[in-house]
Amino acid sequence: FIGLYFFNKGSQSKHKSSTEAIFSNDLEDIFKFLIQNGEEAIELARVDTLWRISGNDTLEVKSRSMDNLFDKVLKVNRGTIISENPEKYGKYSVDDSTGTHLAVIDSKGETVGYYVFGRSKSDYSRSYIRVGNDPNVYLADQNVTYMLSTRETYWGEKQKVEIPPLPSIPTDTSAVTN
């Protein structure tokens, strides 16, 4: 009976789910993001303190979209291993053609994080993730795939131009005759 208890306890500990943040490097050292989904891709690059959409000088990057990238996407936790079989990547939408790829690049031009996100078809509040060269597919603790759009208009908006108020025109009512 005691042997069965320890055997059962040992087999249960193998299936425990631990969570781990996907990105642990210094956020201040990130200078570029590359996001790709299928044939569509976008590059976001930091110039001094401002983020820019590479190849687009008419849109100003939305701070809310960048905040989501730093505060939500990079802070996603990977949990339970869903699959250890690369042949099942398509099932979890984390293969080359259906996954959303995110590369995080530092000031030296080195890739410090590479992730492939896939939507969960059964639980819309979560997503699947592959991390770097790790062949495992993990369940992420939240769904952030919608924050990884390749559309320029998701990341940027037309620059707001301040239009000065028109000078007031004095109205002289003394010239009005009844």
Where are each of the predicted segments found?
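Secondary-structure "cap/kink" motif recognition
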Residues: 1-178
